[in-house]
């Protein structure tokens, strides 16, 4: 959290940002990334306090100006939208987008429905859960791709997420449902993943086109690749699709903006020229080695420049959000 000068001495339930003192297992490189962002915001000149307790802000006696949330992987259903909802309740500016927009982005099936209503090209898909069960017959032609309906970091995606038959879908989907997850089954898209990072502004700013590297079948991005990121990213040319992608981004911004920053993840088959949107990510990775910083560097901007811009734009976006309304207890 970025806060006013002198707030560090009394903020309730502060946690040491050094994860070596309080280790978090099973999260790959994310704890280190979170710590690096904490330090980067400090280095800009903000007074920053780290806390894993959202209610710390309420005990800060009005001395917190902004919540820069990295908290989207914790033990509750739909954790990604909690912080934005909570900050709206206590009326303090926060990173990302309003909670209703976060909810659209975090529910990959809902994203698909909204994008289809905007006449954007998305693959066919169906949501599955333990309550609904798995249809006996395939609702659309294969091959198929099976993943979690909710969640970040390509959670649950493995090489066998590509399914050539509905029988294989049944097996893969049951594995995820037995782990307690809702499932999204999509029509598998040939090609490669291309992510398009976008900054908020008076008009959305497309930073570039980035391919997450993959050594998996179909060049898919699996959970282990996302968590450990040993292959990294590379800039790619989208050939003659730039104007079409810009049109996609404008449609999304017109319907869902303003947002502080986001990514649109495509699957592009350069042989056929077909592009399909898989999902949208808000409050996504801002690490120096990630897609957003890589794209920004092509324009001469550093991670520090990005953080300064995003925080400043976010504060401006929420300039009418009253802090600590008098009706709050």
Please name every model-derived segment:
Residues 11-13, 147, 186:
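Short beta-strand segments
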Residues 42, 88, 116, 177, ...:
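Anion (oxyanion) recognition and catalysis
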Residues 164-247, 270, 274-276:
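Phosphate-binding site of ATP-dependent enzymes
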Residues 87, 187, 197-198, 253-288, ...:
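Conserved metal-phosphate-binding beta-hairpin within the catalytic cores
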Residues 211-262, 294-329:
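Active-site "cap" helix and flanking loop/linker of ATP-utilizing ligase/carboxylase catalytic domains
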Residues 1-6, 102-184, 191, 243-246:
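Active-site nucleotide/adenylate-binding loops and adjacent lid/helix of ATP-dependent enzymes
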Residues 1-94, 100, 129-136, 318-321:
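ATP-binding N-terminal substructure of ATP-dependent carboxylate-amine bond-forming enzymes
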Residues 48, 93-94, 122, 144, ...:
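Hydrophobic beta-strand scaffold residues
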């Amino acid at each position: 959290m970025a806060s006013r000068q002198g707030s560090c001495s009394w903020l309730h339930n502060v946690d040491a940002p050094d994860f070596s003192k309080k280790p978090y297992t099973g999260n790959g490189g994310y704890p280190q990334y979170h710590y690096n962002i904490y330090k980067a915001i400090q280095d800009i000149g903000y007074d920053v306090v780290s806390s894993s307790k959202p209610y710390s802000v309420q005990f800060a006696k009005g001395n917190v100006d902004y919540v820069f949330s990295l908290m989207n992987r914790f033990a509750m259903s739909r954790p990604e939208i909690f912080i934005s909802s909570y900050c709206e309740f206590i009326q303090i500016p926060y990173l990302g987008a309003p909670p209703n927009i976060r909810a659209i982005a975090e529910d990959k099936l809902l994203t698909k429905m909204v994008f289809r209503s905007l006449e954007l090209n998305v693959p066919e898909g169906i949501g599955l859960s333990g309550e609904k069960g798995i249809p006996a017959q395939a609702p659309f032609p294969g091959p198929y791709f099976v993943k979690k309906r909710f969640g970040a970091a390509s959670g649950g995606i493995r090489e066998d997420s590509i399914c050539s038959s509905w029988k294989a879908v049944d097996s893969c989907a049951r594995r995820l449902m037995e782990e307690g997850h809702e499932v999204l089954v999509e029509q598998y898209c040939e090609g490669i993943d291309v992510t398009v990072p976008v900054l908020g502004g008076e008009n959305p700013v497309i930073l570039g086109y980035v391919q997450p590297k993959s050594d998996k079948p179909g060049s898919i991005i699996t959970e282990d690749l996302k968590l450990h990121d040993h292959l990294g990213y590379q800039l790619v040319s989208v050939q003659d699709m730039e104007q079409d992608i810009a049109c996609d981004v404008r449609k999304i911004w017109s319907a869902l903006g303003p947002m502080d920053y986001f990514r649109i993840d495509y699957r592009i088959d350069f042989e056929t020229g077909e592009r399909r949107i898989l999902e949208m990510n808000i409050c996504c990775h801002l690490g120096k080695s990630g897609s957003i910083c890589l794209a920004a560097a092509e324009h001469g901007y550093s991670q520090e420049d990005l953080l300064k811009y995003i925080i400043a734009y976010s504060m401006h976006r929420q300039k009418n959000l009253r802090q600590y309304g008098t009706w709050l207890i």
